[in-house]
UniProtKB/Swiss-Prot annotation:
The gene is env. InterPro entries: Gp120_core_sf, Gp160, GP41-like, HIV1_Gp120. GO terms for molecular function: structural molecule activity. The lineage of its organism: Viruses, Riboviria, Pararnavirae, Artverviricota, Revtraviricetes. A lipid is attached at residue 758 (S-palmitoyl cysteine). This is Envelope glycoprotein gp160. Residues 297-330 are annotated as: V3. It comes from Human immunodeficiency virus type 1 group M subtype F2 (isolate MP257) (HIV-1). A motif (Di-leucine internalization motif) lies at residues 849-850.
Length: 850
């Protein structure tokens, strides 16, 4: 009976076991994805950061007093790297570019910084007694191209009282001033003052300061990169499909000018017109030439410079006298080159915007806006450009046949020494006169224009503009943007981290801030293969950059304070280290230090992205993937951190068990030797105890006078009185007697004990399994009965609800029908009553007549 019951139980248990095994196989067939961390992925985001400068200042000028202070920049890379990003498109917007604002602030700061140690000319705010300047004229052999106005009509000879080295004494001095720098007092023809005295303080530029522009390369710190658009016809906004990454921009000359852009970069294929809104007359239009137009500017007269002491330790440098050629300063431009350029501008406007354009001079404003202002060898020129733009229509240019090769357009120029730079109120600069003849040759590479505007006009008028120096820098930085590199990426894979296992951590390496972007256009699968290459040189790149910046900072230690560039270099150093430490901190928190690919125990949630693994790794780039899961990145990071915290807690709990941290260690050779040692000790203890008890038993029986039988003698096991030894049939034949075998030897004794222990363990285990199987079977049967009961109950209540609903509908239908019948009956009665009215009237009349 027991065997049959056991077989039945095992049949039920086998059936349920097969069912659970099938469910397990089905569940395991679906691949579960886990979050995996990747370090060194080619992903970036738009950002603003502190840029630093690189320049070859020593190659341009040995004098260290250049106003742009580029000697404080790091040296340029002799072989700059430019990495083309294949299969990458990026949006650019030159009108909202932080690089432009940053360069503008840098140039202003450098300008102000160069004037800090210079002399303040506050003592010159006194009454000036001025007369017309008398110039010693020396005839010139060639005056055909010079303006008719001489320099004597542009200058005033002024005398004034000034404090000497001894404060309580004054002396009378004289100096030549330009008419633009002085204004009359109370409309007097002889009393004048400097133009700035009622509005701003005046600082004289230091005598050794040079204003010649030196190319400045803006560079991104480690952890950031500069993206460059290489489309030859890029208009400054929109999507660029030819993108590369560079460490530094090209050399940008900080030329401060209005109307005409000087010595900038040229367009490669054709002239480019750029505007944020071409129909808005408040927006500046930037025109970039393909071919430059040469402009040669000259101050012919030969000045002498004299020093006037205006107090202890302070000197004012003024123009002493003018010797030689007294022609006015002027600029010469090739007539053919200029008019060819205007025709090309009109053609481009016709092609791009379907508008016919003409050119007119500036509509008015400050002198810096209405003229072409620029600096030439330390003197500030203001040139009248009316002759360049005085053309109502381009047809006028063509009809006048301005095609002669040797014809020259001469622009009359005026010079100012008191300059209010950057259109700021409250601060002005006095530029000391430059001795000798001044001449500078430049290339016009672009124009700053404004449009008169108007709705529905097919013809437009263009005028020269400028004044906001941001447009000057924007004309060079239009193709750049700064991005922040995000080397940490997460993606789903089938790999899961092996939890609670101790191992040595490798030394971490980084990803070079420029080189690893080379895989940006590749699919995620292809990029992940090259993670080692992409991530190898970040730390070394940072160290190299830090070394270069440190050398540049050390070069300024002789100064009392750092320049603008020095501060930026310190900021770049700190920022680079912070970026690297931040990434390494996250990797450490996640338990991924020193790993390029780091599986985790966080399951991938399909709500983050329900794309298949093949679709993700085979078709998407890392940039596309980052945009896909960008909203969930913080959530994933928190889950990884929580999982790592739990993992570390589990490791701590497991390590508390000392050597039980790894199951496989139980099968090592040293463990087996330890197991054998324990086994021998247990067997020896059992044998020793058996010997002790046997000896004690023999001694006890000897003391009682009893001699033991042979150890090989089998002693019959006496049966109880209730069980006789014979059987009833065949004369009481005896049954087989049971006997107890007395073993001989200690090994036989140990084996007998061990066998008895195994038999006992087997019986106990078998009984336990049978009880467990029977319990499980009964539980499953009870559960099945409960489910069937619940199902029957649900069916019963469903049927009841159905019957109730049908009954309710029937009653409702009956009530509606009865109500409808009553309404119809009432209407019929009312109708019959109305129809019977004439009959009742007739009957009433008949009765009345009778």
């Amino acid at each position: 009976m027991r065997v049959r019951e056991m077989q039945r139980n095992w049949q039920h248990l086998g059936r349920w076991g097969l069912l659970f095994l099938g469910i397990l196989i089905i569940c395991s067939a679906a691949d579960k994805l886990w979050v995996t961390v990747y370090y060194g992925v080619p992903v970036w985001k738009e950002a603003t950061t502190t840029l630093f400068c690189a320049s070859d200042a020593k190659a341009y000028e040995r004098e260290v007093h250049n106003v742009w202070a580029t000697y404080a920049c790091v040296p340029t890379d002799p072989s700059p790297q430019e990495l083309v990003l294949g299969n990458v498109s990026e949006k650019f917007n030159m009108w909202k570019n932080n690089m432009v604002d940053q360069m503008h602030e840098d140039i202003i700061s450098l300008w102000d910084e160069s004037l800090k140690p210079c002399v303040k000319l506050t003592p010159l705010c006194v009454t000036l007694n001025c007369t017309k300047a008398i110039i010693n004229v020396t005839s010139s052999n060639n005056t055909t191209l010079a303006p008719n106005v001489t320099i004597s009509e542009e200058m005033k000879n002024c005398s004034f009282n000034i404090t000497t080295e001894i404060r309580d004494k004054q002396k009378k001095e004289y100096a030549l001033f330009y008419k633009l720098d002085v204004v009359q007092i109370n409309n007097s023809n002889t009393s004048y003052r400097l133009i700035n005295c009622n509005t701003s303080t005046l600082t004289q530029a230091c005598p050794k300061v040079s204003f010649d522009p030196i190319p400045i390369h803006y560079c991104a710190p480690a952890g950031f990169a500069i993206l460059k658009c290489n489309n030859k016809t890029f208009n400054g906004t929109g999507l660029c499909r030819n993108v590369s990454t560079v460490q530094c921009t090209h050399g940008i000359k900080p030329v401060v000018s209005t109307q005409l852009l000087l010595n900038g970069s040229l367009a490669e294929e054709k002239m480019i017109i750029r505007s944020e809104n071409i129909s808005d007359n408040t927006k500046t239009i930037i025109v970039q030439f393909k071919n430059p137009v040469k402009i040669n500017c000259t101050r012919p007269n030969n000045n002498t410079r004299r020093s006037i002491h205006i107090g202890p330790g302070r000197a004012f440098y003024a123009t002493g006298e003018i010797i030689g050629d007294t022609r006015k300063a002027h600029c010469n431009i090739s007539e053919k080159q200029w008019y060819d350029t205007l025709i090309k501008i009109a053609t481009e406007f016709k092609d791009q915007y379907n508008k016919t354009v003409g050119f007119q001079p500036s509509a008015g404003g400050d002198l810096e806006i209405t003229t072409h202002s620029f600096n030439c060898r330390g003197e500030f020129f203001y040139c009248n450009t009316t002759i360049l733009f005085n053309h109502t229509r381009v047809n006028d240019i063509l009809s006048n046949n301005h095609t002669r090769e040797n014809d020259t357009i001469t622009l009359p120029c005026r010079i100012k020494q008191i300059v209010n730079m950057w259109q700021r109120v409250g601060q002005a600069m006095y530029a000391p006169p430059i001795a000798g003849k001044i001449q500078c040759n430049s290339n016009i590479t672009g124009l700053l224009l404004t449009i008169d505007g108007g709705e529905g006009n097919e013809s437009e008028t263009l005028r020269p503009g400028g004044g906001d120096m941001r447009d000057n820098w924007r004309s060079e930085l239009y193709k750049y943007k700064v991005v922040k590199i995000e080397p940490l990426g997460v993606a789903p894979t089938k790999a899961k981290r092996q939890v609670v296992q101790r191992e040595k951590r490798a030394v971490g390496m980084g990803a070079m801030f420029l080189g690893f972007l080379g895989a940006a256009g590749s699919t995620m699968g292809a990029a992940s293969i090259t993670l080692t290459v992409q991530a190898r040189n970040l730390l070394s790149g940072i160290v190299q950059q830090q070394s270069n910046l440190l050398k540049a900072i050390e070069a300024q230690q002789h100064l009392l304070q750092l320049t603008v560039w020095g501060i930026k270099q310190l900021q770049a150093r700190i920022l680079a280290v912070e970026r690297y430490l931040k990434d390494q901190q996250l990797l450490g928190i996640w338990g991924c230090s020193g790993k390029l690919i780091c599986p985790t125990t966080v399951p991938w949630n399909l709500s983050w992205s329900n794309k298949s693994q093949d679709e993700i790794w085979g078709n998407m780039t890392w940039m596309e993937w980052e945009k896909e899961i960008g909203n969930y990145t913080d959530t994933i990071y928190r889950l990884i951190e929580s999982a790592q915290n739990q993992q570390e807690k589990n490791e701590q709990d497991l390590l508390a068990l000392d050597k039980w941290d790894n199951l496989w260690n139980w099968f090592s050779i040293t463990r087996w030797l330890w197991y054998i040692e324990i086994f021998i000790m247990i067997i020896g203890s059992l044998i020793g105890l058996r010997i002790v008890f046997t000896v004690l038993s023999i001694i006890n029986r000897v003391r009682q006078g009893y001699s033991p039988l042979s150890l090989q003698t089998l002693i019959p096991n006496s049966r109880g009185p209730e069980r006789p030894g014979g059987i009833e049939e065949e004369g009481g034949e005896q049954d087989k007697d049971r006997s107890i075998r007395l073993v001989s030897g200690f090994l036989a004794l140990a084996w007998d004990d061990f066998r008895s222990l195994c038999v006992f363990s087997y019986h106990c285990l078998r009984n336990f399994i049978l009880i467990a199987a029977r319990t499980v079977d009964k539980g499953l049967k009870r559960g099945w009965e409960v489910l069937k009961y619940l199902w029957n109950l649900a069916q019963y209540w469903g049927q009841e609800l159905k019957n109730s609903a049908i009954s309710l509908l029937d009653r409702t239908a009956i009530a509606v029908a009865e109500g409808t019948d009553r309404i119809i009956e009432i209407l019929q009665r009312a109708g019959r009553a109305v129809l019977n009215i004439p009959r009742r009237i007739r009957q009433g009349l008949e009765r009345a007549l009778l």
